[in-house]
Structures are given as C-alpha cells and as structure tokens.
Amino acid sequence: MANLTPMMQQYFDIKKQYPDSLLFFRMGDFYELFFQDAETASRELEITLTGRSCGLEERAPMCGVPHHAATGYIDRLVSNGYKVAICEQIEDVSQAKGIVKRDVVRVITPGTLIDTQLLDDKKNNYLMSVFGSRTGFGLAYVDISTGDLFATEIKENIHPQMLIDEMGRVLPQELLYFIETDKEDPTIISMIKKRFDFYTNGYEEWSYEDTFALNQIKDHFNVVSLEGLGFHPSHLGINAAGALFHYLKTTQKRALEHINHINVYSIHEKMTLDINTRKNLELTETIRSKSKKGSLLGVLDKTSTAMGGRMLRKWIEAPLIDPVIINKRLEAVQLLKEQIELRQELKESLKKIYDLERLAGKISYGSVTPRDLIALKNSLSYLPSIINGLEKIQGETFQSLVQSIDPLDEVHSLVELSILEDAPLSSKDGGIIQEGYHKEVDELKNASTEGRQWIAQLEQKERVNSGIKSLKIKYNKIFGYYIEITKSNLSMVPTEYIRKQTLANCERYVTPELKEIESKILGAEEKVILLEYHLFIEVREKIAHEITRIQQTARAIAELDVLYSFAEIAAENNFIKPHINTSNEIKIVEGRHPVVELTFNKESFVPNDTYMDNRDCSMSIITGPNMAGKSTYMRQVALIVLMAQIGSFVPASEASIGIVDRIFTRIGASDDLAQGHSTFMVEMSEMANILNNATANSLVILDEIGRGTSTFDGLSIAWAVIEYMQQYKKSKTLFSTHYHELTELEGKIQGVKNYNILVEEDGEEIVFLRKVVSGSTSKSYGIQVAKLAGLPLNTLIRAQEILSDLEKKNNEIKIPAEEEIALSRESEGNSRDTNGIQLDLTSFSYNEIIEDIRSLNLLETTPMTAMNLLYQLQKRISSL
C-alpha cells in the first residue's frame, strides 16, 4: 500500500491496532469510517455508503456521521454488539504541520458505556469478567458509569449452574472470560451463550495469570497487599478482577479514579435465588412482555432518584439472611411510615436530586459538562433540608444516614461562583464562567461587547455615508464580518469597499476599518473561549478531588430513597411490618399477592392464610381446578417472604417469617428448544437442582410436578419427590397437583398437609372462590374450565361422555399405608432399594401396557410391526 495518501496511511496505522472495533476517524466536524467498517456501519445505521480517493486504484468505501450527533449512532452500533474505537484529532488543526495528529481516545463496548443518554437510569450497566479454574470460578464486575465494583468466587459444591445463577442476578451487558477447561470441554461457555444474549468476549489468558492480575489490582488501588480489600491470597476473584482492570485500561485509556472501592462478597451471605426462580416470580420484569410494569420491582419502585432505583433493584435481586440487618431496615420503614408530612417533604427534595453516582463517574472521566456541574450544585442545595428532616427521626439507621450525607458546601460554593446558571452544554463554546470569578475573563468579555457596539455604530455610519438604507454588517465563521449590499444598490457602493463574495441577490464587501474592528473582536472572543475552557477544567479537577465524598452521599441518598419507597408503598396499600426471626416457621395471616392485588381491584382480592414449619406442616399439597388460583397463592407466599427479607412491609394482616436461605420454584411448562430440551427434561433438570440443593431453611414452590410425561410416570415421580423432600430435606414446600391420589399421603408421611382452593358449583357452572382451606378435593373441573375458555359445545359434550366412561372404569391407585412406607424406607439403606414401593407401582406399568395394546390399530399393523410390538411387550413384562 505504498501509494496510499498520507491521511489514509495514518488511518491504516491506527486501524491495525483495533482490528475488532469500528474505527470512528475524526475529520473536521465528522467521524468517517472506511473500507469494511464503512460497509458495516452503512448497513447497520442505514446511512449512505460513498467513496473517497485514497491513493489506490479504487476509491475507499466511506460513510460518516456528524460528530455532534455521533452519540445516537454509536448507541445503535454498541447495542448490536459492536465495539467502537473513537479516534480524535489530538492537536490544533491550525498549528499542525502536515497531517494532523490523531489517536484513539476510547473504545466503547456494551459494558463500558458512560454516556447517560445511552443508559437506563434505574439499572446498572455491568461489565463482568469470569475466570474458570479447575478449583472453581472467580467473578468480578463493574459499572464504570457509577464506579460500583464487586468480586466473588465459587469454590464449594462447584457446578456451572451456580455460575449461571450469579450471572442471572447481575445480568452484565458484556462478559470477558477465560475458562481453563474450555478447550477440553466447552460446555460452560456454550451454556452461557445459549442462556444469555449479552456480548461475550474470550479474553487473553495471560491477563488472568496470578501475578499479572494481582499487580493490576495493586496498581489501581495503590496498595501493597489485597487483604485490606477483602481478598484472601488464593481468592479466584483476584484473577477475574485483574483481567477486568487490564481491559478497562486498554479500552478507556485513562485513570478511573471513581472506581475507588471493591466489594468482595460471598455468594452465601445473601438469599440464593436461581435464574428460574427470578424468572418465575417476575422479580424485575414480567415473563411475557419483559417489562418492569407487572413485576415486583414495578410495584415497589416509588423511588425519586436514579441511585435509589438502582439500589432497590439490587435489594430485590439479593435479599438478606441476617435478621439484625433486616430488622434495622424494617424499623426505619416503620418510622418513615409514621411521618406523613416528613415523607412528603423528602419526596419533594429527593425528586430534585441529580444522578450523583453517574455524575461522579463523568467527573472522573473528564466528560462532565457545564450543565452537569449546575445540576450537581442544584442537587447539593437540597441536602441541608434532607439532613434537617432526618435529624427529627430517632433511629440508628437515620443517625447513620445523617452522618453519611455530606452537603459538600465548598463544592456548592465553587460551582455557584464559577459557572453560569444557563451555561451551554459544551465546555468549548464559551459562555460558561460567571462574571466576577476571573478578572481577565471579565476584561475580555467587555472588549468583545464593546467590539459589537463598534460594529453597530459602524453599520449606522456606513448607511449614512453610502446612502444605502438596507446596508447590513453580518458575520459567519468562514468570512468573518462583512458588509452586505443588495443587487439593486450596487451602483451606490463606495469605491473604498473591497468585494469579498458575489451571491445571486447580493454582494459582500469589507473595509480596512471593519477588518481592524473584527481583529479586536475575534481576538477577544477566541481568548475568552479558550480561557473559559481552561477555567472550567480547573473547576472540574477541584471537584474531582471530592469524588469519594460525592459517592458516599449518593449511596446514603439512594438508601434513604429506597426506605422512603417502602414506607410510601406500605402506607398506600396497607402493608404491615413482618416479624423476622430465626425459627423454622412461616406464618402469614390474610396474605395477598403484592402485584395481582394492585393490578386488579383491591377489594375483590381474596386473602389467604399460610402456616409452614419443618416438622408438622412442611409439605402442603394443594389441589383445585385450573384457574382457581393455586399458582397465584404459591407465588404470593414466596413474594411475601422475599419482601420481608429485603426489609419491606408485606401485604398481610400479620406475618412472622423465619429466615429463608433459598427460594426454589418449579413452575410452568416450557420447552428449552435452544438447548434441545423437552418440557419434561427441563422440568426434571430443575427438580434435580432443587432436590440436590434445598435445605431445611429453604422455601420450595412446586407446581404440577410430573405433568410433562405420562400419567403413571408423572404420579410416580411426584410421589417420590414428596417422600424424598420429607425424609431428607424437610424444606418448607408448597406442592400443587392434579394427582389427587397424592392427597392420601397426609397422615402417612409426617409433615404432609392437604389444602384445596374452594370452588362453588351452580348447576353446570363453577365459581372460583380463591380461598385456600384445609383438606383435599377429588374433582378437577377441567371440562368446566374448558367451557370458560370457549371450547366448542360439541367438543365439551364429547369430553363429558368420555369422562363419564373413564370414571366407570377407573381403578383406584393404592397409596400404601404409613407402616408400608416406613418399612420401605427402612429397607432402602444406603443402596436406596425401593422394592417396598415398587410392589405398588407395578400396577402402573401393567396399566400402561394394557393401554398400549388397547390403542393398537390392528388393521393398519403390518406383520413385521406386530412382531416388533410383541417383542417389546414381552421385554417390558419380563422386567416387572
């Protein structure tokens, strides 16, 4: 490429350093893209693809976007998974000798967005790094827009699902990873890519190496040991965090001083919620529409600030298990709930506070604007009133918040004295600095103002001297100041006028006097713009030294905002303060579903009681027809427990919650086609996770276990699950089913209790009463529900005929007596021999064989097919 033009050679030299990024190459007022980058951007952004001479035989494909409008275009590209390298002109064009110097100042990726226009204000934008070794996983993730940085490791009971679950909680926008075993077994990364749609990036192995990673963290925090940060020497989070810092250095190309703290945590210090539970309980978004409205977050979010909204989301995604911390939150909510006037005052102040966390990030980044600093000043002005209000409330939490909220008086004063209230968005266009802040700025502005007055006086003088009443003196950036004369008055133009430009309707002229005045005006304006810019940078750097204080205040305001939100919701919806304890009991009186009752008419929602423990009522078997409300009730219990453990009041008239370490849910039927799993396979995989990981302190929600297979297989599995849970786990379990045979287990297996949803029959119609009561029901009302769903009448009539026929032929499945079950368990031993139960289950297999023979169409069966069927039947009977 010896024939390339100098500019294009410069482009290629820079592009070679960023082969995986779209290079936005600054040329004047535009960012230009060339060759393959141009073709990609043209397609993705739907902009015109043109060409440019580059020294080669063919023109270089090219497209471009205006630099002042680039943000929206970059957002579209990054949202589609592209990296964008921003290449700026790094020297003044007027002082450049030859080609102006250019260099990449930042690489923008999905996980490194900082522009608030591109971010959800109430959701963190995380970049995650994962290190997979043969001993476990290390995770580190950061939101560079706020400075939040976290690290953890997974070492005990290592399973990829634990990694998936933690990723499901954090939901990063971008993932860096290195898995030691990936070449031997790519299963883990395959699982991640199939499960999530965020941008994944296999990163350099050496950046995860122990010593390199350790030094990256030490260098950033300027420490000699990581123990003070919360890491033990072999913590796998070190490897992940070290690679994360290296990636940030190479893409952001600046010190990220607002990332000044790392939160090293254990995944066991909060309630564990696997990815299925988060989805099934619709904690932050609904299953169908993926929207916040209709989720628990949508109900609880009365926050007024962006920081508060993000903190609320974090609390919902990671409920507490420490009753001391939970009760402190609940006490704070109680005190705020009682202070009606103060809550209103807080709301008025909170809603006027800017996003201080992301503002601190922009200050550190150097991307803060004059208007941002005005927003900071205005936000700080409301802090004294918030502090005064909190000082009126007794309580440890509020005393702590008062200590943490720093009004930053000197920062407020600095901005008030230095930055104009109506300052422009850009820091490079002047009009920023307050009068009286800097003597030279004032003098230059006066000179510029006087110059404009001279222009007005000159315009009036030239009109008189020339006799041209329409004469005007105008200005543009290309020609500067000029005298404009219309075509009809050209004969009156004085001879000393110098023609500058001819247009269709007028001529433009200059005079020596005009050029002299122009020189004074423009010289003063250029100087003041440059000086104001430097003064703005000076103010910004002074504030940058207070970033830690701004972040501390932001966190305190966020916590206050969430507590306010909880208090407001409790007051509006008659939520009560739950009693949190370390017992193994859950007692809820007149509990209500927090989302459903607010979505529909509050008065029409039917409350229900719940009692569960680890001994006498650990397994609640719930029967009732479809649409009766079984799933709503079970989700309701789970949500009330979760709300209590994040420190929120709950929808009930009374609630006593023993701390729950995990919530499991197996709800609904959905094929996981992307991973080649059927409905039943998904169901069994989720069930295996529950049976393997539930504890006596877990809450388990099981909806229709076994319905993804044949009736007898499904019943067998459901029955076995109940036995296993009761014998080995003792978890508090809500188990809804249409297998009415399972209700016979009450009184035969300790802890099993039957409940049903009341239904009222009115002739052929049914009315769902939504009330959960003790006891079982033997009717499913399936045909009545089908009628409500709108099935054709002839189909319903035929279904009723078939049902009557089947009921006549029905053979009861025998549930063994309590003594038989106990004997069966004793005979199991370590070998898990299930012969005791198998005697009863044999009838299931015989019935299945009979059904297979009965359904055989002999007229369509060939001799060869018949022989094969006989062989299979003989084989199945022999195994019984």
From Swiss-Prot:
A single GO BP: mismatch repair
PROSITE patterns: DNA_MISMATCH_REPAIR_2
ATP-binding among keywords: yes
Membrane-spanning residues: none
Pfam family membership, one: MutS_II
SMART domains: MUTSac, MUTSd
Alphabetically ordered keywords of this record: ATP-binding, DNA damage, DNA repair, DNA-binding, Nucleotide-binding
Binding of ATP, residues: 624-631
Glycosyltransferase in keyword set: no
Database matches in Gene3D superfamilies: 1.10.1420.10, DNA repair protein MutS, domain I (3.40.1170.10), MutS, connector domain (3.30.420.110), P-loop containing nucleotide triphosphate hydrolases (3.40.50.300)
Any one GO molecular function term: damaged DNA binding
Biological role stated in the UniProt entry: This protein is involved in the repair of mismatches in DNA. It is possible that it carries out the mismatch recognition step. This protein has a weak ATPase activity.
Family assignment from sequence similarity: Belongs to the DNA mismatch repair MutS family.
Official protein name in the record: DNA mismatch repair protein MutS
